[in-house]
Amino acid sequence: LHNLDGVQIRWVPTPNSKKLNAIVYSFFATVRALFGGYDIIHFHAEGPAAMVPLAKCFGKKCVVTIHGLDWQRAKWGGFATRFLRFGERMAAKYADEIIVLSASMQQYFADTYHRQTVRIENGIDPPETADLSPLSRFGLEKDGYILFLGRIVPEKGIHYLIDAYRTLQTDKKLVIAGGASHSEE
């Protein structure tokens, strides 16, 4: 048992198998939560949400946060895609509440599952004044660039951004910044 800023962290050991790690981890974490004395289990993402029916069998309240439609991501295929869609359906059918991060995701659940969701968008507390010194390091000026900031993965459609930028008549520079996904791609 570890503690981080007043939050207890409980480790759930799983076998080291890339292909099944997420499924096995979700199962073991759910079983541990079932017997941990918790009133509510909060599942993050579609894959872990496949375990919601198990938790409901034990009378637990379940909240699921859907961060995106993971099954649409290019890194998944075959069984993983089907499992993620299964988890999405289990969340829609059995979760007490579903949290989504955008209006489009909220509409997706309404259209696809006739399911109401709670939208809580990601946000930040912007600094009162921005430090513009990093701009000069890259030859950029305030309001002189178009910025993409996010994971650099195929499903973000950065190639469409580049194609669209090439058609613009602008003096603004295109800046693409971000990291890769946690996948091996």
Task: Please give the residue ranges for each predicted region.
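Glycosyltransferase donor-sugar binding loop
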Residues: 124, 149, 173-185
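Membrane-proximal helix-turn-helix segments that form the acceptor-binding/catalytic region
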Residues: 31-34, 57, 80-98
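A short helix/loop element that forms part of the nucleotide-sugar donor recognition site in Leloir-type
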Residues: 129-140
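Short His-centered aromatic/hydrophobic patch
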Residues: 43-48
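A short, charged, and often flexible helix/loop element on the N-terminal side
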Residues: 5-31, 73-80
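A short, histidine- and acid-enriched strand-loop-helix "catalytic/donor-clamping" loop
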Residues: 17-19, 35-38, 49-50, 63-80, ...
